[in-house]
Curated annotation (Swiss-Prot):
Keywords attached to this entry: Ribonucleoprotein, Ribosomal protein, RNA-binding, rRNA-binding, tRNA-binding
Record PANTHER family: 30S RIBOSOMAL PROTEIN S13/40S RIBOSOMAL PROTEIN S18, SMALL RIBOSOMAL SUBUNIT PROTEIN US13M
Name of this protein: Small ribosomal subunit protein uS13
Region span, Disordered: 92-119
Function summary: Located at the top of the head of the 30S subunit, it contacts several helices of the 16S rRNA. In the 70S ribosome it contacts the 23S rRNA (bridge B1a) and protein L5 of the 50S subunit (bridge B1b), connecting the 2 subunits; these bridges are implicated in subunit movement. Contacts the tRNAs in the A and P-sites.
Origin species: Halorhodospira halophila (strain DSM 244 / SL1)
Example of a GO cellular component annotation carried by this entry: cytosol
Length: 119
């Protein structure tokens, strides 16, 4: 298996699809990384030579991904909660942040319904 950014990417998949298994790299970014590294995106990872894998590593290193990205997102949410702004309060209360209605929906964000016995 090829190891890029501390992640073992699947060898049986095409290069661009395998790159999407890294947190922070989606389809568009994976294709642009393959183009910048000069790697044909439709070639499977097991068929890449060491130079191509190293070129992919170099290109992936230019982006904020994996642990750094997760930490950055968590710090952004924590900053909103510390500020006490509307979005921070919604995060703190576990409610939808982006203006969705909550009277009837938002079950994913609010969690399962509690019956009268558990209140």
């Amino acid at each position: 298996m090829a190891r890029i950014a501390g992640i073992n990417i699947p060898t049986h998949k095409h290069a661009w699809v395998a790159l999407t298994s890294i947190y922070g790299i989606g389809r568009t970014r994976a294709l642009s990384i393959c183009n910048a590294a000069g790697v044909p995106h439709d070639r499977r990872v097991r068929d890449l030579n060491d130079a191509e894998v190293e070129a992919l590593r170099q290109e992936v290193g230019n982006y904020v991904i994996e642990g750094d990205l997760r930490r950055s997102v968590a710090m952004d949410i924590k900053r909103l909660m510390d500020l006490g702004c509307y979005r921070g309060m919604r995060h703190r209360r576990g409610l939808p942040v982006r203006g969705q209605q909550t009277q009837t929906n938002a079950r994913t964000r609010k969690g399962p319904r509690r019956g009268p016995a558990s209140r």
